[in-house]
Amino acid sequence: ADMGMNIAGGAYNFGYNTGDAGGHSRVESGSGSSVAGSYSYVDANGDRRTVQYTAGPGGYQASGDVGVDRRTAAAAAALAAMAPKAPIPAPAAAPAAPWYNPVPVAPAIMAHPGGYIAKW
């Protein structure tokens, strides 16, 4: 693996290259609030993918191999088509209309069945 770095006066640059089967590499430089660089790698299909980027007050902008790999996407779409589909839920029934059911209440005072008898 190769690596280099330089920092001076608020600016920097660095880079590395792994040199392995994954072929990872990256270079970047920046000054103040702006950064520019690129990275690359070898994807699962054996293709080298390279992305260039800049970042600063306007946000992050990438170009190059930033899209989906067409071969991988086609295989993924075929597999997704075979996957079981989620059931479509039945529409929920509307709630029942409110209704009123009065409950009979015993009176608070009841007459005695034998009448009232006063004893003095």
From Swiss-Prot:
One of its GO terms (molecular function) is structural constituent of chitin-based larval cuticle. Residues 9-87 form the Chitin-binding type R&R domain. InterPro entries: CHIT_BIND_RR_consensus, Cuticle_Struct_Prot, Insect_cuticle. This is Adult-specific rigid cuticular protein 11.9. Transmembrane segments: none annotated. It comes from Araneus diadematus (European garden spider). Keywords: Cuticle. One of its GO terms (cellular component) is chitin-based extracellular matrix. Component of the rigid cuticle of the spider.
